[in-house]
């Protein structure tokens, strides 16, 4: 690779490629979450019969992975480039390899392997058949066919591609620490994210208010359930995401025992399942508008 793309250029290249494949370019969702899959642009849109093709960058917070900015590859917050396509194109794997070529990675010149790694997110009632994608010995992506989301069967088949932007960028720029990555215009990743990484790690492991976190989880759960009863799916889902992030903070703080952990995950899963069910019911009442739109376009 003659020119080393900045993180910014990698994002722009992926956006252009997937937009050309018919994906809408969405923006990052503004509630904390542990993975791009948890954005409503994937979680809610993967269920039901309506077609959906979208791509977006999603900052993902995992408090227990924080290392005060001292570890070159483990982060409190990392970034994913998320692609979700429903129904899944038959050539989606080839499209993924083409996207790597656009980044200057020729599959014929590199060792690219799809390593079986079936995926699940028990707290959100999600599961699928999947593969890790390894590039010359480094995992750079996760490739998944959803089977279940929010406890509901996924039909038609939905494919998800998640690029780990920090790992992919580290490979392309040939750096050993994410903090040495060029984000754009000569500005380093560490210039932007090192201080937040340290502060968020310190908060998660040392300074968070344990009583407050316990109270917040309970109150967020109550509000999610109340809005489900009100038929307000999206506010309910926001509070479900807040419960998930609050639980992750509690877990990082060492507040959750093994037996308590299962109970908290059950509570989050029950919220997610109720929200998914209500979302599909509401879309059905509206006649699945995006399905109608797709049918009209094919006439």
From Swiss-Prot:
The keyword Nucleotide-binding applies. It catalyses: tRNA(Gly) + glycine + ATP = glycyl-tRNA(Gly) + AMP + diphosphate. It holds the Pfam family tRNA-synt_2e. It comes from the Bacteria. GO terms for cellular component: cytosol. Its main location: cytoplasm. It is an enzyme of class 6 (ligase). Keywords: Aminoacyl-tRNA synthetase, ATP-binding, Cytoplasm, Ligase, Nucleotide-binding, Protein biosynthesis. InterPro entries: aa-tRNA-synth_II/BPL/LPL, Gly-tRNA-synth_heterodimer, Gly-tRNA_ligase_asu. One of its GO terms (biological process) is glycyl-tRNA aminoacylation. NCBIfam families: glyQ, PRK09348.1. Belongs to the class-II aminoacyl-tRNA synthetase family. Tetramer of two alpha and two beta subunits. This is Glycine--tRNA ligase alpha subunit. It comes from Lactiplantibacillus plantarum (strain ATCC BAA-793 / NCIMB 8826 / WCFS1) (Lactobacillus plantarum).
């Amino acid at each position: 690779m003659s020119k080393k793309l900045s993180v910014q250029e990698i994002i722009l290249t992926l956006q252009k490629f997937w937009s050309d494949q018919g994906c809408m370019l969405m923006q990052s969702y503004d509630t904390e979450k542990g993975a791009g899959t948890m954005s409503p642009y994937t979680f809610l849109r993967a269920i039901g019969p309506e077609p959906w093709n979208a791509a977006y960058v999603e900052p993902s917070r995992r408090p227990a992975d924080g290392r005060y900015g001292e570890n070159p590859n483990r982060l409190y917050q990392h970034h994913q480039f998320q692609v979700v396509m429903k129904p899944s194109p038959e050539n989606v794997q080839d499209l993924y390899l083409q996207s790597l070529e656009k980044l200057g990675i020729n599959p014929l010149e590199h060792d690219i392997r799809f390593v079986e790694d079936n995926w699940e997110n028990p707290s959100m009632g999600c599961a699928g058949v999947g593969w890790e994608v390894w590039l010359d010995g480094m995992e750079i992506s996760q490739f998944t066919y959803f089977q279940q989301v929010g406890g509901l069967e996924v039909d038609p088949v939905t494919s998800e591609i998640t690029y780990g932007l920090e790992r992919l960028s580290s490979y392309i720029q040939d750096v050993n620490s994410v903090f040495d990555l060029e984000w754009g215009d000569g500005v380093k990743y560490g210039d932007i994210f090192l201080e937040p990484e340290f502060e968020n790690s310190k908060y998660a492991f040392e300074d968070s208010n344990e009583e407050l976190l316990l109270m917040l989880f309970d109150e967020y759960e109550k509000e999610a359930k109340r809005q489900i009863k009100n038929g307000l799916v999206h506010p309910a889902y926001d509070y479900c995401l807040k419960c998930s992030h609050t639980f992750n903070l509690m877990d990082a703080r060492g507040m959750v025992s093994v037996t308590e952990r299962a109970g908290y995950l059950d509570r989050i899963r029950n919220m997610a399942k109720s929200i998914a069910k209500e979302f599909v019911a509401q879309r059905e009442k509206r006649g699945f508008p995006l399905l109608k739109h797709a049918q009209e376009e094919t006439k």
